[in-house]
């Protein structure tokens, strides 16, 4: 059922269909309806269409649970969780009887909150044995207002073989009294976790299907069913002849998602009848139907109708329903309706998230460093465009990438960054022109002897010529296209008496190369902003050396426009007060801009096998990042750009350190939410 992620188009693509006419041996997952449970079923669903709140129970007794048709993720009904008096109030579900203790399960449900602010939903496993009661947070999700959101928790049942009872507790700890809604509660083993919805009508209700025409009758039927006792019978009015039925699905759909719809159709007229299936959209002003599948259904044969829907990342509609419609005014039957998520198990971002760069548009640019592969990945591209208004090529503009051998400039990939930024109105930071790493050895090799250059005047001239040619060729090519350059990178070593790193650049040219680099870059593009960039700028000794370097260069009239503070840090170091001291120091240099160029916060060395403690570390990471941003906002007159060194954790140069805003699956961490709304980040 899985397939690789496809390019998202500007409008959502309505994709392929295939139909199987005479079905002889269809294979469906084992299914249990809500009131006919099998203890080891692979898929269990409660959709509340029977108007019962089961299996949800009050937690505690003051909570009010009510089935309502005022809103739903799918079908017709959901459960309102009201009467809350405490942040821990919510619902509890005893899931013990559903579990085979040799399997791993996904427990999921859809939740909606209608307050005017962000809220956090929490899912806790409560494990009770003969001696003890233990609670473990199984899932947490930040909810935007008025958007149905899927919340999933994995339960490794084999870890709890000695448990007498396992409860699932759902609450909204960011609010003591606000109500919320729950719909489509499912328990399924991981083999079937891609299934979002399945209806076989054995729950003795119409499963949330609705007739488009109020004169059309839909009822349960025992005279026709594919494999069990019941199916859904549709009888259009002979007056209106409208046999179209609808199934509301808006809450199930995620922007950028891919969904498979499958159902069985049976009709017993005297000839084949064409059936169509698709989606009906309502934007609040008008409706539109889009057919996903058409098929002739032969008489007296169950026929599978299958269609796939791809949603664009900008998809929006007030209401969405799946529809089935015969071309003739005949009675017909439906059975085994299902919706599957083709992207399950694959990383898919939440395209409803608030935009970071929009949040900070009145403070500074929000940037990200990305490798070239991100520009070729449509999912990465959408994330970049939503959250960032500045990008830095991670390695693609470093000397070894642009001039791997003398005179052999290679601009094709760097040009793609320029084209990408121009197309999407994103600013481009160039990184970096001069560095002691990722610079080809030929820069420092005598072209005649093959020996390493020395500090002789002749060799100095060779290296200066190479430096000038490289800078002016690169900066000149991107004149007016790169708004800021990290001209010189990491030239300071606080352990040296004079503070200069003993790199090949320094050993051959002395500190002169720094000054020359800025002058030549300015000549090539007088409007580009030129930065000195370095790490550990929070170290008092190092920042003092950098401060003196920049102040001296500016005193000589060298065109240095800003300092880049990399900010590769950890939970333990530095203290946020040192970051503020660094900003304060450089803000004393008149006209100097400050860019935070490579932010990440490593937590790896603190991590353990204890999930609760690791969650605590993620909270600490978020709180530290929030404190840093409080400082940066305070100095917004000089801090003009803030860049994160990576799009998500597995793209980071510190891959195992979980240092960025999103996890490997694009899911926002507490660090992200600390910059959007700190109130949803746990306090502990």
Curated annotation (Swiss-Prot):
Residues 40-190, 193-342 form the CBM-cenC domain. Residues 1-34 form the signal peptide. Pathway: Glycan degradation; xylan degradation. Gene3D superfamilies: Galactose-binding domain-like, Glycosidases. It catalyses: Endohydrolysis of (1->4)-beta-D-xylosidic linkages in xylans. Its EC number is 3.2.1.8. One of its GO terms (molecular function) is endo-1,4-beta-xylanase activity. GO terms for biological process: xylan catabolic process. Keywords: Carbohydrate metabolism, Glycosidase, Hydrolase, Polysaccharide degradation, Repeat, Signal, Xylan degradation. Residues 350-678 form the GH10 domain. The active site is at residues 490, 598. Belongs to the glycosyl hydrolase 10 (cellulase F) family. PANTHER family: ENDO-1,4-BETA-XYLANASE A (PTHR31490:SF90), GLYCOSYL HYDROLASE (PTHR31490). This is Endo-1,4-beta-xylanase A. It comes from Caldicellulosiruptor sp. (strain Rt8B.4). The gene is xynA.
